[in-house]
């Protein structure tokens, strides 16, 4: 088993400003010094990391900078976490542009797992058919990740369609995507993590 450390514990989580007016430019970003964070993580014995998409795509103009940084500390980037709404059909095309850009960058630096969060909750709440829209969006995302040799997996997340046990079960009944079980999110959403993993 490979165990990694998520770098988002090292700073505030924000969204890239471009995403406010352009869906394809939305990103999660951890406000941290990436190299200092990598140094701290490897010092305590972890050799694999997961980052948020913005901390990966920040290096899109020169991926070698990130590749060299990982090599300097004898580390690898095992996964990247991305987010999307998936249920708004007029935005889905641009969300796939976003996911493709992240997948392309991930492949360049040797990432294996493409961890997906999402499934927006509408202002009027989860509506009939929303879970199916999420599942269809995830299918499109899986097609993209397969092109780049990445393994797509879904991370049930607080504040999304897949937060509560019945919501999570409904999604995985509608989708064959692999799972990334975040124990804290599962527990906070009311799902016993061990029960979920055994399923």
For every predicted segment, state its role.
Residues 106-128, 151-157:
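Active-site groove signature of glycoside hydrolases
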Residues 1-109, 139, 146, 150, ...:
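N-terminal pre-domain/capping segments
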Residues 62-68, 92-100, 127-138, 165-166, ...:
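Charged helix-capping and loop-helix junction motifs
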Residues 9-11, 53-55, 83-86, 118-122, ...:
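Active-site-proximal loop/turn and secondary-structure-junction residues that shape catalytic pockets
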Residues 13, 17-32, 125, 165, ...:
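Gly/Pro-rich active-site loop or hairpin
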Residues 25, 54, 90, 129, ...:
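Conserved short-loop catalytic and cofactor-binding motifs
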Residues 48-49, 139-199:
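Acidic/histidine-rich catalytic cores of soluble enzymes
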């Amino acid at each position: 088993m490979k165990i990694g450390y998520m770098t988002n514990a090292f700073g505030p989580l924000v969204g890239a400003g471009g995403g406010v007016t352009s869906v394809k430019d939305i990103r999660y970003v951890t406000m941290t010094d990436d190299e200092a964070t990598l140094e701290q993580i490897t010092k305590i014995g972890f050799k694999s990391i997961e980052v948020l998409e913005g901390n990966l795509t920040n290096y899109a103009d020169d991926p070698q900078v990130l590749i060299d940084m990982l090599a300097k500390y004898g580390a690898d980037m095992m996964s990247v976490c991305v987010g999307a709404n998936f249920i708004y059909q007029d935005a889905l095309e641009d969300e796939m542009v976003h996911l493709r850009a992240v997948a392309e960058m991930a492949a360049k630096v040797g990432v294996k797992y493409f961890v997906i969060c999402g499934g927006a909750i509408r202002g009027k709440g989860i509506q009939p058919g929303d879970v199916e829209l999420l599942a269809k969006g995830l299918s499109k995302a899986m097609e993209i990740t397969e092109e780049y040799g990445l393994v797509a997996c879904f991370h049930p997340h607080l504040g999304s369609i897949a937060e509560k046990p019945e919501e999570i079960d409904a999604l995985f009944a509608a989708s064959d995507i692999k799972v990334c079980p975040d124990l804290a999110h599962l527990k906070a959403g009311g799902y016993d993590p061990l029960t979920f993993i055994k399923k």
